[in-house]
């Protein structure tokens, strides 16, 4: 009897864990953050956990926010803004690595779907930016740095500490989808393929096999914006 109860307990625990940490093919779907808050977010669990000397992150976002907001927040256990993608305003993005940031500017339309990619190479410190398949100006930061592992990766909020410290005035409101991350710098040809909807086997975060945890009022819905809508800005 005790053995049966023990097995039942293990089964219930396993079920709860599966609900909390789902691995799902999210092709054609988006995370929707419907409101400004400090409680609504999605935690992403990486497939590969290692210190990073190179990376590429790509995703699609659709929002009508005009205030500053976080798009991708990756914090290490010790330190702040280990890897942060932040949007200050229309046509202005910030990339932070090891709590040092750089800004990039370009042409965007308000409340238009955006496909965004950024990559960074430690050996040169060069960060590249691509918006709707078009390259923006390259910048440099944190040459020789290594992005720490064991991250807390959050969508919908900006972390001021490891896994928390949220501010509703920095929260994201809108849709995020097709988020993938690699431990390498993708070539321009590969970036264009990703922009066209080819994921190219991401090994850190894979939208087609994503581990995530939903928190607060965040939901999954079919993507209503066609991929062709992301090439309005050229």
UniProtKB/Swiss-Prot annotation:
Gene3D superfamilies reported in the protein's UniProt record: 2.60.120.200
Binding locations of Ca(2+) 2: 158, 160, 170
Family named by the database record: Belongs to the pentraxin family.
Pfam families per UniProt: Pentaxin
Limits of the Pentraxin (PTX) domain: 27-226
Positions with a binding annotation for Ca(2+) 1: 81, 158-160
Subcellular location: Secreted
Top-rank taxon: Eukaryota
InterPro entries attached to this UniProt entry: ConA-like_dom_sf (IPR013320), Pentaxin_CS (IPR030476), Pentraxin-related (IPR001759), Pentraxin_domain (IPR051005)
Record's signal peptide: 1-22
Cofactor comment: Binds 2 calcium ions per subunit.
CDD domains in the record: PTX
Glycosylation sites: 54
Keywords: Acute phase, Amyloid, Calcium, Disulfide bond, Glycoprotein, Lectin, Metal-binding, Secreted, Signal
UniProt entry tagged with the keyword Protease: no
GO CC list: extracellular space
Disulphide connectivity of cysteines: 58-117
Cofactors: Ca(2+)
General remark: Plasma concentration of FP are altered by sex steroids and by stimuli that elicit an acute phase response.
Annotated protein name in UniProt: Serum amyloid P-component
GO biological process: acute-phase response; innate immune response
Record keyword Metal-binding present: yes
Subunit structure: Homopentamer. Pentraxin (or pentaxin) have a discoid arrangement of 5 non-covalently bound subunits.
Gene Ontology molecular-function annotations: carbohydrate binding; complement component C1q complex binding; metal ion binding
Protein source organism: Mesocricetus auratus (Golden hamster)
Main location: secreted
